[in-house]
Amino acid sequence: MTTVKRTVRLITDQNVLPGGEAAVLNDQSFPVREWSIKLVCLNPQGEETDASFVDRVTYKLHPTFQNPTRTIRKPPFQIKEQGWGEFEMEIIIYYADKGGEHRFLHYLHFQQEHYHEDIELNINATRPGLLKALTATGEVPGYSDEGEEARKDKRKNESEVGAGKKKAKAKPVDMDKLAEGLQKLQEDDLLQVVQMVNENKTPDMYVRNDIEGGEFHIDLYTLPDNLLLLLYSFCAKRVTM
């Protein structure tokens, strides 16, 4: 498992809305304000840049807002609203490639027109897509594009293992096409493949779940005929075989 440190900056801007109608509470008048919050990353030089390793950010506003749970999917993950009251909100950062999340609380106040809060993240990065996305904002220990390509080749080779003597035994599907089809599947489909393999697992099958590496290894030639047919049908419905 690779732990990557990143610093993100939550930036708040607010001002009194010109011509806005003031709210009155307990004989006190509160002007309506417009405010915005956005999330950026600090690079190694301390400069603000897009948090490219973030998939989306969810803001849980005060329940008096219409649709108080807001999810923003594009950098700088900015939300804009109007209101008169200060309040505490929960913010959730979701990492790329389904690589986890980070939750924290942020208090929206109107003492300053512009202010920011820096948040230190310790990201346990196991997903290849997250590791690659993190390289845009700084160093990632032990990661390189060349290493990722090597891992892809390794997965491909393992899915095709046994092409020699194991091919002597007739199989109910074209094993080469099945191996190619599995390589073309999207991540959500691959998760279903893992589930099908686990549900039909037998003692003769070679299956290895590398949790730390975020990889799932299978020897297709050790799978029973019924599972091969199931996987082939699954792939054929989703990719060109």
Swiss-Prot record:
GO terms for biological process: chromatin remodeling; DNA damage response; regulation of transcription by RNA polymerase II; transcription initiation at RNA polymerase II promoter; transcription initiation-coupled chromatin remodeling. Coiled coil: none annotated. Its main location: nucleus. Residues 1-137 form the YEATS domain. GO terms for cellular component: chromatin; Ino80 complex; nucleoplasm; nucleus; SWI/SNF complex; transcription factor TFIID complex; transcription factor TFIIF complex. Gene3D superfamilies: 1.20.1270.220, YEATS domain (2.60.40.1970). Keywords: Chromatin regulator, DNA damage, Nucleus, Transcription, Transcription regulation. Residues 141-169 are annotated as: Disordered. It comes from the Eukaryota. GO terms for molecular function: histone binding; RNA polymerase II general transcription initiation factor activity. CDD domains: YEATS_Taf14_like. Functions as a component of the DNA-binding general transcription factor complex TFIID, and the RNA polymerase II associated general transcription factor complex TFIIF. Binding of TFIID to a promoter (with or without TATA element) is the initial step in preinitiation complex (PIC) formation. TFIID plays a key role in the regulation of gene expression by RNA polymerase II through different activities such as transcription activator interaction, core promoter recognition and selectivity, TFIIA and TFIIB interaction, facilitation of DNA opening and initiation of transcription. This is Transcription initiation factor TFIID subunit 14. It comes from Schizosaccharomyces pombe (strain 972 / ATCC 24843) (Fission yeast).
